[in-house]
Curated annotation (Swiss-Prot):
Record's protein name: Photosystem II CP47 reaction center protein
Gene giving rise to this polypeptide: psbB
Listed NCBIfam families: PS_II_CP47
InterPro entries xref list: PS_antenna-like, PS_II_antenna-like_sf, PSII_PsbB
Membrane topology (UniProt): Multi-pass membrane protein
GO BP term (any one): photosynthetic electron transport in photosystem II
Entry similarity comment: Belongs to the PsbB/PsbC family. PsbB subfamily.
Cofactor: how bound: Binds multiple chlorophylls. PSII binds additional chlorophylls, carotenoids and specific lipids.
Subcellular location as annotated: Plastid, Chloroplast thylakoid membrane
Highest taxon above the source species: Eukaryota
GO MF entry, a single one: electron transporter, transferring electrons within the cyclic electron transport pathway of photosynthesis activity
Amino acid sequence: MGLPWYRVHTVELNDPGRLLAVHMMHTALVAGWAGSMALYELAVFDPSDPVLDPMWRQGMFVIPFMTRLGITKSWGGWSITGGTITNPGIWSYEGVAGSHIVFSGLCFLAAIWHWVYWDLEIFCDDRTGKPSLDLPKIFGIHLFLSGVACFGFGAFHVTGLYGPGIWVSDPYGLTGKVQSVNPAWGVEGFDPFVPGGIASHHIAAGTLGILAGLFHLSVRPPQRLYKGLRMGNIETVLSSSSIAAVFFAAFVVAGTMWYGSATTPIELFGPTRYQWDQGYFQQEIYRRVGTGLAENQSLSEAWSKIPEKLAFYDYIGNNPAKGGLFRAGSMDNGDGIAIGWLGHPLIRDKEGRDVFVRRIPTFFETFRVVLDDDDGMVRADVPFRRAESKYSVEQVGVTVEFYGGELNGVSYSDPATVKKYARRAQLGEIFELDRATLKSDGVFRSSPRGWFTFGHASFALLFFFGHIWHGSRTLFRDVFAGIDPDLDAQVEFGAFQKLGDPTTRRQVV
C-alpha cells in the first residue's frame, strides 16, 4: 500500500480477520515475555535468606506478582517463606512460567492461522457482503466475560473457596503468608490496606460488569448516540475501550504501588518512601523496646527481641526513592547484600545524656551529622570546620554502646569509631553489607516498587496523549478529511483555496 512506517496499523482498519490476528500475536508476546522473565528471575534468584535478602532486594519483578496471587513454592525444593518442600505441584513458580510460555505458543500459532485465513464468513455482514464488526455487540461480550473473570477472582480465588487466597501480612510486613480472605462489605472495605476490600470490590465490580455486559448485548444504542460517538469506527474502540481504560488503570496502580496498599505488600515489593519519611518502623521499634522495658527487661534484652526483619525495614537503603531512576541493577548491586544487623547504637555524651542522630531525609545525598537530646537541643555534631566547633565528638566526649544485633553489649569511646557509627546511624539501623560478592558500587538503587511506579506513570502519560490523539481522530474524522458534512453540491476536490471558505470557487460537475 506504500504506507509510511507510522501508518502500519491502517492495514487492520477494515480487516477484522487480521485485526484479530495481530491482537493474538500481541497476547503471545506479552505471555511469552512474562513466562520467559519468570524463568530468568528464577535462574538468578537466591531464596536462602528471605529476611535480609528478599526478592525485592534482588530486583525481582515478576516473582512478587506471582507470590501475591498465591504462588509460594518452587520445583527447586524451596519455599518463598523459607525452608524446603517436597511436593510443590503444578502451580509452582516454574509451573506458572511454563503455562505462560505454552499459552504464548498457542496464541502465536492462532495468530498465524488467522493472518492466513482472514476472510472468514463470521466477519461478513449479511446485508452488504462486506467484512464488518458489530462493535457494540462485541463490547457487550467483552464486558460480560471480563465481569465473569472479575467476579470469579474475587468470589473464588481471593476467598479461598476455589483457589489459594492472596498474600496477607501485618502492617509491619513481618508475618506475611498466603491465606484466604473474607470480603469486607462495610466501610472498612474502602481502606486500601484492608485485604478484604480486594475480594468485595472484585465481586461487586464483576457483578456490575456482568449486568452491564448483558445490557449491551440486549439493547442497541440509539442512532444519535451511535453516530455521535462514532460507534461504527474501530478507532473509537482503540481510543476508549483500549487506550483510555489502560492509561486509567496504569495511573491507579502507579498510585497503589508508590503509596502502598494491600495489593502491594512490603514483603514482596519493599517498603515505601513514606515509611522512612514518617519514621514508621522506627516508631514501632521504639514502642516494642518501651514495652519490654515496662516488663522489667534490660535494654539489651528489649533490643535483642526486635526482629531483624523489622530493623532491616528501618534502613534508608531500602527506601525506593533513594535509588536514581536511571541507575540500573538491583538494590543488592548498590549498597550490597545485607549479612546481619549490628545492633542499635545508643549514643551518650559525657554527662550520661542520651543523644540521637538526626536521620537523613530521603532526597539528601549528604547530611550533616547532628546529635540532639530528647528536647531537640543540639548536644554534639561532626563539624565542617573544627576551628569553630563547639559540639564536636571530641569536645563533648561522646560514647556509643550497641544493644541487640551482632555487637550487643559492645561500646566504643574513641572519637573516630563513634563518628563512624554516628554517620551510619543517619541511614537508620546499622547493617553489615557484603559489597564484594556482586561488586556492588555503594550507590543506592531503587526497589521494584520504584521501577513499577516509574514505568506505569510514564506509560500512563503516554497513553493519555494517545487517547486524546485517537479520540480526536475518530470524532473529527470528517473535518480532518476536509469534507463538509452539510455539503450538497458536488465539488472538485483540490480546487479549494481554503478549507471552509464559502467564497471558494465551486465547480458543479
